[in-house]
Amino acid sequence: MLDNLKERVNADAALVRRGRWVSLSFLLGIGNEDYIVTIDEGRISGIALRNLATISGVFSIRAASTTWEEHWRPMPKRDYHDIWSMLPKGLATIDGDLLPLIQNLQYFKDVIASPRDREV
């Protein structure tokens, strides 16, 4: 599911510029699998399957794989189009230190939505 995340983010000059002050790792949970996404100055430098429970990011965003599949469709259904819309419906959870997420909210929302096909 994350096959093209790194390439899409790093190829988007406007997105990288917006995240130029972001250097951290966060956990992206897709179903039963957790991935550590490492960002250096707005560019994704690595995405790795978390193999130890002690490895974590600054914050985590988790949802079922079917939720992410819908989120990444070209035109997601209502409540699936945005991570903030998924939270009150119980479709996603966010934990950890939320300060860097909130300070760079549009950047992270765009990073997470970047696997979405743009063609409708």
Which functions belong to the PLM regions below?
Residues 1-120:
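Feature captures hydrophobic
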